């Protein structure tokens, strides 16, 4: 018996139902890798960031997330090289979906109880996504802008509903605007830390501030 189509589980009807000691025997999600590309690239190497944003309140299956990840990665590797980008899938499939299996063979009415005791067995996992929530983000060099938009456009076809592609005003995966980022870095208010930055507030011990600016 094949997998039930994901259109049956598209809408968020019930409360979140995660894997727990009460909900056991859940199959592993199809998506296992959430960061790919050159994920150890420093923050200043990939200034451009683009997001795929959901326009609907719905559920996305782990199979769809994996298919979109593969699709975007394949196009970006072909156009920008395997070290020219960093993709991050921002959704994790924690919600467990159930199926109440029905027999369709001869004499099935003797074996099954129909809708009596209809609480189903775990079938798979989905991610619940809200309107305006980011599904997938890509950071890369500024000259690859068109390639990023095309990669996300292709990945959109793996999902139901409507998604929008948004080119961010922020610098890479940080929360700071591109126009302010270089100035804050020069003033040592930001310190690069992997693919992100540490923000140094303007208050605290004077000795720490002097030690920071002495370097």
UniProtKB/Swiss-Prot annotation:
Phenotype when the gene is knocked out: Morpholino knockdown of the protein decreases head size, but not body length at 2 days post-fertilization (dpf). Show decreased formation of actively translating ribosomes.
Top-level taxon in the UniProt lineage: Eukaryota
- Which PROSITE patterns has this protein been placed in? RIBOSOMAL_L10E
Q: Which UniProt keywords apply?
A: Cytoplasm, Developmental protein, Ribonucleoprotein, Ribosomal protein
InterPro entries tied to this protein: Ribosomal_uL16, Ribosomal_uL16_CS_euk_arc, Ribosomal_uL16_dom, Ribosomal_uL16_euk_arch, Ribosomal_uL16_sf
Q: Which GO CC annotations does the UniProt entry carry?
A: cytosolic large ribosomal subunit
Q: Which GO terms describe its biological process?
A: brain development; embryonic brain development; regulation of translation; translation
Q: Which Pfam families match?
A: Ribosomal_L16
Q: Where in the cell is it found?
A: Cytoplasm
Any one GO molecular function term: translation regulator activity
Coarse class of the primary localization is cytoplasm
| Job description of the protein | Component of the large ribosomal subunit. Plays a role in the formation of actively translating ribosomes. Plays a role in the embryonic brain development.
Assembly and partners are described as:
Component of the large ribosomal subunit.
**Per its UniProt record, what PANTHER family does this chain match?**
60S RIBOSOMAL PROTEIN L10
Q: Which family does it belong to?
A: Belongs to the universal ribosomal protein uL16 family.
How is this protein named in the record?
Large ribosomal subunit protein uL16
Please give the organism: Danio rerio
High-level lineage: Eukaryota, Metazoa, Chordata, Craniata, Vertebrata
């Amino acid at each position: 018996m094949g997998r039930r189509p994901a259109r049956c589980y598209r809408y968020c009807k019930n409360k979140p139902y995660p894997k727990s000691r009460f909900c056991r025997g859940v199959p592993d999600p199809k998506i296992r890798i959430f960061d790919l590309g050159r994920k150890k690239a420093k923050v200043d190497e990939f200034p451009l960031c683009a997001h795929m944003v959901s326009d609907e309140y719905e559920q996305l299956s782990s199979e769809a997330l994996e298919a979109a990840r593969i699709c975007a990665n394949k196009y970006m590797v072909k156009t920008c090289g395997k070290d020219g980008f960093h993709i991050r899938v921002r959704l994790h499939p924690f919600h467990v979906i159930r199926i109440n299996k029905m027999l369709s063979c001869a004499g099935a009415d003797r074996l099954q109880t129909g809708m009596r005791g209809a609480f189903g067995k775990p079938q798979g996992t989905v991610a619940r996504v809200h309107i305006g929530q980011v599904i997938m983000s890509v950071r890369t060099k500024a000259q690859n802008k068109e390639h990023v938009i095309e990669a996300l456009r292709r990945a959109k076809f793996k999902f139901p509903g409507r998604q929008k592609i948004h080119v961010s005003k922020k610098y890479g995966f940080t929360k700071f605007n591109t126009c302010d980022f270089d100035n804050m870095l020069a003033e040592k208010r930001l310190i690069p830390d992997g693919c992100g930055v540490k923000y140094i507030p303007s208050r605290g011990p004077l000795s720490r501030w002097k030690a920071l600016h002495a370097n």
